[in-house]
Amino acid sequence: MKEFIIKANKAVTNGEINLKDLPGSSGRLDLLCRCVNSAFFLSHDMRRDTIFYSVNYGSPNPPVALKFVGSELKRVSPDERSIALFIKKALEKDASDLWKESTSGIYSSKREFRDIISEKKSEGKRIFYLHLNGKPLEDFEFKDDEDFLFVLGDHIGIGDEDEEFLEELGAEKISLSPLELHADHCIILVHNILDRLK
């Protein structure tokens, strides 16, 4: 199982989303939509072995975590507007400590970025933090029977405190490129690496 989590520092935390202004008034929700696209959509199929989390820290009610489960997703199209509509529905739910399903395979909860990562660590997932200054990809060995969580930052990053948290947790810091990449591009590169193990 492949899982991804992104800290969305400015992404809105209620359903008041302007679909005509995803990058601006919605707190770079366009970036989140592109990550969902990269996590799940193939040319004529979807990745069913993937889960994607976004933890939104924008106004008015942070944090709100969103969970997308590939094996359960239905009716979502790959374009940003369609994905944003489904995110809007999820954010219209009153978030609580429990995951609440808004539409098939999409859930929301009142959870912190660190809490989800800690939970995945306790489940035995191998945690990778994707960072420009990490060890080169070639230095790591991946096995097809392992479960992974890949941690991503948005255009702002995850911040020093969360980086320290990941280091203390034993997350492996990995670099996919000598150049700084967009989060959605990193997801595609990770998928490509793991696809080749099959």
UniProtKB/Swiss-Prot annotation:
Determine the domain of life of the protein's source.
Archaea
Give GO cellular component annotations, separated by semicolons: cytoplasm
Reaction(s) catalysed by this chain's protein: pseudouridine(54) in tRNA + S-adenosyl-L-methionine = N(1)-methylpseudouridine(54) in tRNA + S-adenosyl-L-homocysteine + H(+)
Which EC numbers characterise this protein's activity in its record? 2.1.1.257
Q: Subcellular localization, per the record?
A: Cytoplasm
GO function term, MF aspect, one: S-adenosylmethionine-dependent methyltransferase activity
Keywords recorded for this protein, A-Z: Cytoplasm, Methyltransferase, S-adenosyl-L-methionine, Transferase, tRNA processing
Coiled-coil positions are none
- Please report which protein family the annotation says this sequence is part of: Belongs to the methyltransferase superfamily. TrmY family.
* Oligomeric and partner information: Homodimer.
The protein's name: tRNA (pseudouridine(54)-N(1))-methyltransferase
> Which gene name does the record give?
trmY
